[in-house]
Curated annotation (Swiss-Prot):
Any one biological process term the GO annotation gives: nucleobase-containing small molecule interconversion
MF terms in GO: purine nucleosidase activity; uridine nucleosidase activity
Alphabetical keyword list: Glycosidase, Hydrolase
Signal peptide: none
Superkingdom in the source lineage: Bacteria
Pfam entry (one): IU_nuc_hydro
Organism: Salmonella schwarzengrund (strain CVM19633)
Family, similarity comment: Belongs to the IUNH family. RihA subfamily.
This protein's name: Pyrimidine-specific ribonucleoside hydrolase RihA
CC annotations in GO: cytosol
Amino acid sequence: MALPIIIDCDPGHDDAIALVLALASPELEVKAITSSAGNQTPDKTLRNVLRMLTLLKRPDIPVAGGAVKPLMRELIIADNVHGESGLDGPALPEPSFAPQSGTAVELMAKTLRESSQPVTIVSTGPQTNVALLLNSHPELHTKIARIVIMGGAMGLGNWTPAAEFNIYVDPEAAEIVFQSGIPVVMAGLDVTHKAQIHAADIERFRAIGNPISTIVAELLDFFMEYHKDEKWGFVGAPLHDPCTIAWLLKPEIFTTVERWVGVETQGKYTQGMTVVDYYFLTGNKPNATVMVDVDRQGFVDLLAERLKFYA
């Protein structure tokens, strides 16, 4: 039986590719997709979900827009990474269908309530929608199998010296998620910076030759430009968000550890930092499965294999 999932995302190039990977994988049943503000403004991220589902010919999947700002802060966006539309680069279709009239939290709650088995929530943007769901529907916690997030880092940040972007946008929401008691799987920068797509990989995807693999290659062409800056020291572009879906499909290509994670919400220099108790110094019981390494070639091969689904 396929694993039921809800995807909460803020497309974003890597979010879009995570959607492509999920919808090419029969092991997963995508029951709903919700959008969050983050990589771009909330109107643009919602539109990008609809554009991607139009491209992938999946108007059957319920879609709803989420919170327009973080729980306690003003919104920060990453237009310097993802461009004016949030998905700059390829020519994507205009949406062929409309989102549902309700909110992301309402759609998530309805999906959980109606599911015959616990649902995995995959969150590839700020955690605002997920935190609002957890706070407003404690009766549904048992219907959530786990929450798989792209966010955080044990080491260096990518938005501040200490913080990864998704967590930095809404650290209060992320703290709610980590301390919820629901199993959390964290794909942080420690692993996603190793999941780099090289120029040769982009050409491999392009050579698959179907319309979707071509779009993915064009998304990566644009995404690669930001990551060419020498300060990063990257060979390619780190494909953050698809690590969440790849872990669900092939956990064996990842190395993980069980650790306690908390989120700094007040530090002068460390707001948004995920504090990972790697050496068990706090006495707190582990609350997260933390990804620390990935077989990069296995990750690339999985993407290439699933892109052939769209032939």
